[in-house]
Amino acid sequence: MRYTDSRKLTPETDANHKTASPQPIRRISSQTLLGPDGKLIIDHDGQEYLLRKTQAGKLLLTK
C-alpha cells in the first residue's frame, strides 16, 4: 500500500503485495482525550509519557 497526494491508501502495482481494504483511522477530540485538566498519562511499553495541552493551546508529549 502507498499514500497518494490525497493521503488515501491505494494498492501497490507489485504482485507481491496483498491488497487489503484500509480501515478508517480512529478519531477522538483532544478535549475528550485530555479531560478537564488537559493532561493524560500514556503507558507505552512500560514507559510513561505525559500528553498535555500548553497555554498556547498546542499539544506537548514528554517522557
Curated annotation (Swiss-Prot):
Could you tell me which InterPro entries the record lists for this protein? Hemin_uptake_protein_HemP
Composition bias of kind Basic and acidic residues appears in 1-17
Q: Name one GO molecular function term.
A: protein homodimerization activity
Residue ranges, compositional bias (Polar residues) = 18-32
Q: Where is this region: Disordered?
A: 1-32
Q: Which Pfam family is one of this chain's hits?
A: hemP
Family, per entry: To Y.enterocolitica HemP.
* Name used for this protein in its record: Uncharacterized protein YdiE
Whichever gene encodes this chain, its name is ydiE
